[in-house]
């Protein structure tokens, strides 16, 4: 009966965190709108080989992540949940792997379930795992690779070892098809310390070629298909999206070596109090083969991405699966022997919740700021934000009431965040970051437009997805569409600021022309260097400018 109660609690936890509240959150630009529109266009066109965004070739990522996202929209429709269904599914599958692997290592069902709950409630996992980007997919394939390699190396027969390495190659191949060659580098770097300490080089060299073969065979069908359709895809993807993005001086998202330290700290909430002890206990017990393996999969990817010039918080998502397993193991030991770390964890959550309550007041309409984050008419959003932090502090306090038994309720600290964050986003943020909000406010003006132009790729993708049309034209800025716009068949999909007046004269009689621009909050739109418009509708950071036929 206790196992049944645990399972019911787990399903309720998943429903409250990963299912019920997802539709209440609008899509964020540029990431979610981009991936939503790529998958919508894939479904609309039936082209499952070459990714397109706004009808243009889009070679920043391979295809597998778009396949999963497209299946999500196909199953659940073109809505917020459908867009995020793929990443939620991948995150839950990763948690299932965490459960299975923990059970295999320690033969403890409670520990296995706890590891999954810790993983799913980690702030970084929840934030990225309910956000429509490709990182939850690559995290799943990397964790699957972690499990496959362990299976292969622990097998006692040549058949078992061969099957494990073949499975490892498939997971690496799917990782390559999701986000590129990093899916090869991370597993190699992660297993080397374990192989070295355990002196398992022989098995690696004898069977490792099977992983190489299965990886190549996994990628080969689509790799050949896109090479035939778009011969320059692999050149662009390898040199621009890998070498330039991560290693060269002009790499995207440049950040210092220590960038991931605050990411690890914030991402470990509401289990931050367990982080030092889990890592220290793992190092202290490094003679234990499984502990070394988990430590290696936690630390080595972190070091690899720290050395790379280009950095984003999402890159290290896979590190938190083995870390959650180490945390769960350490937490049970602490509960039995010395619950000091569990008490510290409770106080950290209380402090975080109280700090959030105070910060919410400071940026509210009743606080000291001249330009508050929320306006007076948004008072219900302020109370939602207060509720988020109040619940966080409450469950932090509850874990201290009988810490040896109640410490695991820290998993409920983010419950308010999960349920209420969609209702607490300030309008000033929604107007710039949620194109759906803008479309809802300007639907009647946008719908009959013959041409729509915008100066933001994220906004363009949001407009395209909301209006179910891929013919949005870029104005003044090309952004990440620069490469796709260079093709001859993309002519007419970009209009520069200097050319706009002439372009307008040529196309005005064809129907309503709508210009959607991103502007600064205090920018005077009358100073914009554009022809006089027939209608202007400003929604704070986004402004709709319309020209009608004369």
From Swiss-Prot:
Membrane topology recorded in Swiss-Prot or TrEMBL: Multi-pass membrane protein
Compartments it resides in: Cell inner membrane
GO CC terms, sorted: plasma membrane
Reactions mediated catalytically: 4-amino-4-deoxy-alpha-L-arabinopyranosyl di-trans,octa-cis-undecaprenyl phosphate + lipid IVA = lipid IIA + di-trans,octa-cis-undecaprenyl phosphate
Keywords: Cell inner membrane, Cell membrane, Glycosyltransferase, Lipid A biosynthesis, Lipid biosynthesis, Lipid metabolism, Lipopolysaccharide biosynthesis, Membrane, Transferase, Transmembrane, Transmembrane helix
Transmembrane segments: 7-27, 81-101, 113-133, 134-154, 165-185, 204-224, 263-283, 288-308, 315-335, 346-366, 382-402, 406-426
Annotated GO MF terms: 4-amino-4-deoxy-L-arabinose transferase activity; mannosyltransferase activity
InterPro entries: ArnT_tfrase, Glyco_trans_39/83, LipidA_mod_glycosyltrf_83
Pfam families cross-referenced by the UniProt entry: PMT
Main location: membrane
The keyword Lipid biosynthesis belongs to this UniProt entry's keyword annotation: yes
Family stated for the protein in its record: Belongs to the glycosyltransferase 83 family.
Protein's job: Catalyzes the transfer of the L-Ara4N moiety of the glycolipid undecaprenyl phosphate-alpha-L-Ara4N to lipid A. The modified arabinose is attached to lipid A and is required for resistance to polymyxin and cationic antimicrobial peptides.
Name under which the protein is recorded: Undecaprenyl phosphate-alpha-4-amino-4-deoxy-L-arabinose arabinosyl transferase
Organism encoding this protein: Escherichia coli (strain SMS-3-5 / SECEC)
Lineage: Bacteria, Pseudomonadati, Pseudomonadota, Gammaproteobacteria, Enterobacterales
């Amino acid at each position: 009966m206790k196992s049944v109660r645990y399972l019911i609690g787990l399903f309720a936890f998943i429903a409250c965190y990963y299912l019920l509240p997802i539709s209440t959150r609008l899509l964020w630009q540029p990431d979610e709108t981009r991936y939503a529109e790529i998958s919508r266009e894939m479904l609309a066109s039936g082209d499952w080989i070459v990714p397109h965004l706004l009808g243009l070739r889009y070679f920043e990522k391979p295809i597998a992540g778009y396949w999963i996202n497209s299946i999500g929209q196909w199953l659940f429709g073109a809505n917020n949940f459908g867009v995020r269904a793929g990443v939620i599914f991948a995150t839950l599958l990763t948690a299932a792997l965490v459960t299975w692997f923990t059970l295999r290592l320690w033969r403890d069902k409670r520990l296995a379930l706890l590891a999954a709950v810790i993983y799913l409630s980690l702030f970084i996992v929840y934030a990225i795992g309910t956000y429509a980007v490709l990182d939850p997919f690559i995290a799943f394939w990397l964790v699957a690779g972690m499990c496959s390699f362990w299976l292969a190396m622990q097998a006692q027969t040549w058949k078992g070892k061969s099957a494990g390495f073949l499975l490892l190659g498939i997971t690496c191949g799917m990782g390559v098809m999701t986000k590129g060659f990093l899916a090869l580098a991370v597993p190699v770097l992660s297993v080397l310390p374990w192989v070295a300490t355990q002196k398992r080089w022989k098995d690696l060299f004898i069977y490792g070629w099977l992983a190489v073969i299965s990886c190549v065979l996994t990628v080969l069908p689509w790799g050949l298909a896109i090479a035939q359709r778009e011969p320059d895809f692999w050149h662009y993807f390898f040199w621009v999206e890998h070498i330039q993005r991560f290693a060269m001086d002009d790499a995207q998202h440049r950040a210092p070596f220590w960038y991931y330290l605050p990411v690890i700290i914030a991402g470990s909430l509401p289990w931050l109090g367990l982080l030092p002890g889990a890592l220290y206990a793992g190092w202290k017990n490094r003679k234990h083969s499984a502990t070394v393996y988990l430590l290696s999969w936690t630390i080595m990817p972190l070091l690899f991405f720290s050395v790379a010039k280009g950095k984003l918080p999402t890159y290290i998502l896979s590190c938190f699966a083995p870390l959650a397993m180490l945390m769960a193991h350490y937490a049970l030991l602490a509960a039995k022997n010395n619950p000091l770390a569990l008490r510290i964890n409770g106080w950290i959550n209380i402090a975080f919740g109280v700090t959030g309550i105070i910060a919410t007041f400071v940026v509210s309409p009743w606080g000291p700021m001249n330009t508050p984050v929320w306006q007076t008419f948004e008072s219900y959003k302020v109370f939602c934000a207060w509720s988020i932090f109040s619940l966080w502090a409450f469950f932090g306090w509850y874990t201290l009431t009988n810490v040896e038994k109640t410490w695991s309720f820290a998993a409920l600290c983010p419950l308010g965040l999960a349920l209420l964050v969609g209702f607490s986003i300030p309008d000033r943020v929604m107007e710039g970051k949620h194109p759906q909000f803008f479309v809802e406010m300007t639907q009647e003006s946008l719908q009959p437009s013959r041409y729509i132009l915008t100066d933001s790729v994220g906004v363009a993708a949001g407009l395209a997805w909301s209006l179910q049309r891929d013919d949005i034209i870029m104005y003044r800025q090309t952004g990440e569409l620069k490469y796709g716009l260079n093709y001859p068949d993309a002519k007419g999909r970009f209009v520069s600021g200097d050319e706009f007046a002439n372009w307008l004269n040529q196309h005005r009689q064809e129907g309503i022309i709508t210009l959607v621009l991103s502007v600064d909050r205090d920018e005077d739109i009358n100073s914009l260097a554009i022809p006089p418009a027939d209608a202007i509708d400003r929604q704070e950071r986004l402004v709709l400018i319309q020209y009608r036929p004369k």
